[in-house]
Regions:
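Short conserved micro-motifs at the rims of enzyme active sites and ligand-binding pockets
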Residues: 87-88, 107-108, 176-177
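Acidic-leaning, charged glycine-interspersed low-complexity segments
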Residues: 34-39, 112-168
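Small/polar-rich, solvent-exposed N-terminal microdomains that initiate assembly or binding
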Residues: 1-86
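Oligomerization/assembly interface segments of phage tail-like spikes and tubes
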Residues: 86-104, 156-171
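Hydrophobic beta-strand residues in large extracellular and virion-surface proteins
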Residues: 19, 23, 96, 121, ...
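Short, flexible/disordered intra-domain loops and linkers
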Residues: 4-5, 105-115
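Viral structural modules
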Residues: 5, 10, 172-178
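Intrinsic-disorder/low-complexity loop/linker signature
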Residues: 50, 87-88, 135, 155
Length: 178
């Protein structure tokens, strides 16, 4: 499992990669599980399956569908309008998705530990200076409402949820050097 980062991101992708690195480093330590972290992923239309999907650009014009892979993961999308707030300063909403096996994260808890998982993520995000939490979506029909996913479920041991984040003002010229 890996933290799949962009090489030398700019602007909004710097904000996303900073959150991605923070979450990946803290959660892999806290949960002691294999976890895949993805930065900004992109909607695409799969003509063979006749559905809108979420894909991660893996390089060389190749994309990876992030929803159907069997793994613990989180990823971001940024499909909202980007608002200009000043010279080179912008803000937007970013969606952060989690698909995890709660039994792997908390094997000694006998009840469904979905709330414990969300609390861990929220506590880490609240330490961040990159965004604020706008809302948390746990209804599976609403988590992936923009996408036509059939058969995606939220039954034990799996848990899917989405956090809508409001980015703090960021400079579009910011760069992140790996």
């Amino acid at each position: 499992m890996a933290n799949n980062t962009k090489t030398n991101p700019k602007g909004l992708d710097v904000v996303i990669q900073n959150m991605q690195n923070l979450l990946y480093n803290k959660l892999t330590t806290l949960w002691s599980i294999e976890l895949n972290g993805y930065g900004r992923c992109y909607p695409s239309f799969n003509q063979e399956q006749n559905r809108k999907e979420i894909e991660f650009y893996s390089g060389a014009n190749e994309y990876k569908d992030v929803l159907y892979a069997e793994e613990n993961k989180f990823f971001f999308t940024a499909e909202n309008e980007i608002e200009r707030v000043g010279n080179s300063q912008f803000k937007t909403k970013v969606e952060l998705f989690f698909i995890v096996n709660v039994s792997e994260i908390y094997p000694n808890i006998t009840h469904r530990a979905d709330e414990e998982v969300r609390v861990d993520v929220i506590n880490i995000l609240e330490q961040s200076s990159f965004a604020t939490i706008g809302s948390i979506v746990i209804d599976i029909d609403k988590v992936f409402s923009k996408y036509e996913y059939i058969g995606t479920d939220d039954l034990q041991p799996y848990h899917c949820f989405k956090i809508v984040l409001d980015t703090l003002d960021y400079n579009i010229n910011n760069q992140f050097c790996n």
